[in-house]
């Protein structure tokens, strides 16, 4: 039975206010924290040095380098700390265990990539019952999960635009879509959107979805094997960074662009960008991972700092097609915002 403090259903702002207020009182945190915690900066008054925990599905994946720089920059700016945890290979059990450790350790906020439709629902509800704000980032479980907000790309809409671009590039024939981990919510919605867009186009494009795995070498091997079995294919596209790099490598190795094969994918791995500049890939899609690190810290901080008056809000980090026409700045700029440098520098160059 739902009571006034039951957070298992959709969370409204009043519940968040009550939850954060009760937690602060229980922990003995005064409304105006003493200066022994985090110093004030700019508009901020001194406040506790809150600890926010990120639960990630690919902790060592280079895609998340700029995301972690975003986390670090936000923590420095707002006087907070963070912990990076989860799984290296999208193991949902490992991720749930990491989330439970964060709850047991009374983290001040949790950001989790919700790659499974149900596995994170109960720990999310438990965290909220304890007054720990939870946001999802990079991947979202949708309405079945009571997280406060999602920060990341609208993955299905991204897939629709991805599919529309494939339809522009390929007239007919066999197209292969490569995905590291079918069914997981950080990438499966892109495949779903692409399939719908291709179907709605009415073109005689035959699509086959191929699972590639979570290791870069494994992904390339499976993409190579697919090409060897289907040398008359007309397109090779991928919905994750590792598979996109694998597509780029195979297209380059066999000089497939000269045979009319079109190719593209997601994310900004260096070999992917170089392959675009060299004409082997048609495009890749930037989803701004720096923001997927910075903004969860910003939103969790404000939820704490305002006692819940400013609640986390859904934020779409966007979709930007990177092509041969606009790839140069990605290759020549060294910046934390794209993960190509550790150094803070302005102007960016």
Residue spans for each PLM region:
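N-terminal secretory signal peptides
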Residues: 1-12, 24-26
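Twin-arginine (Tat) signal peptide motif
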Residues: 8-17, 31, 35
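Hinge/cleft segment of the Venus flytrap/periplasmic-binding protein
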Residues: 38-48, 186, 197-201, 294-349
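Hydrophobic alpha-helical segments within soluble ligand-binding/sensing domains
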Residues: 45, 95, 151-175, 189, ...
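Extracytoplasmic "Venus flytrap"
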Residues: 49-74, 78, 82-97, 105, ...
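Short, solvent-exposed amphipathic alpha-helices that sit
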Residues: 63-80, 158-162, 185-205, 218, ...
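Hydrophobic alpha-helical
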Residues: 112-128, 194, 208, 212-275
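Flexible loop/hinge segments that line or gate small-molecule binding clefts
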Residues: 118-157, 168-170, 269-277, 281-282, ...
């Amino acid at each position: 039975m739902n009571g006034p403090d039951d957070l298992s259903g959709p969370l409204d702002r009043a519940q968040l206010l009550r939850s954060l207020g009760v937690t602060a009182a229980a922990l003995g945190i005064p409304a105006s924290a003493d200066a022994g915690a985090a110093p004030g900066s700019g508009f901020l008054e001194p406040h506790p040095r809150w600890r926010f925990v990120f639960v990630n599905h690919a902790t060592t994946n280079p895609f998340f380098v700029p995301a972690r720089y975003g986390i670090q920059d936000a923590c420095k700016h707002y006087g907070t700390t963070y912990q990076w945890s989860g799984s290296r290979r999208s193991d949902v059990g490992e991720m749930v265990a990491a989330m439970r450790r964060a709850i047991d350790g009374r983290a001040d906020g949790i950001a989790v990539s919700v790659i499974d439709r149900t596995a994170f629902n109960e720990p999310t509800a438990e965290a909220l019952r304890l007054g720990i704000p939870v946001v999802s980032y990079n991947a979202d479980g949708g309405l079945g999960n009571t997280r406060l907000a999602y920060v990341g790309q609208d993955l299905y809409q991204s897939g629709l635009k991805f599919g529309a671009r494939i339809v522009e590039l390929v007239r007919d024939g066999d197209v292969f879509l490569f995905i590291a981990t079918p069914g997981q919510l950080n990438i499966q919605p892109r495949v779903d959107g692409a399939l719908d867009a291709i179907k709605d186009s009415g073109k005689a494009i035959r699509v086959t979805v191929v699972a590639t795995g979570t290791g870069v070498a494994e992904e390339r091997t499976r993409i190579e094997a697919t090409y060897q079995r289907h040398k008359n294919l007309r397109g090779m596209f991928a919905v994750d960074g590792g598979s996109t790099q694998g597509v780029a490598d195979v297209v380059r190795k066999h000089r497939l662009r000269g045979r009319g094969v079109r190719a593209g994918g997601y994310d900004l791995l260096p070999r992917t960008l170089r392959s675009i500049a060299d004409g082997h890939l048609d495009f890749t899609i930037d989803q701004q991972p720096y923001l997927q690190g910075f903004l969860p810290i910003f939103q969790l901080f404000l939820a704490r700092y305002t006692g819940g008056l400013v609640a986390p809000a859904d934020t779409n980090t966007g979709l930007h097609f990177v092509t041969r026409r606009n790839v140069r700045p990605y290759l020549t700029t060294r910046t934390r915002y794209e993960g190509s440098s550790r150094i803070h520098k302005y102007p960016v160059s």
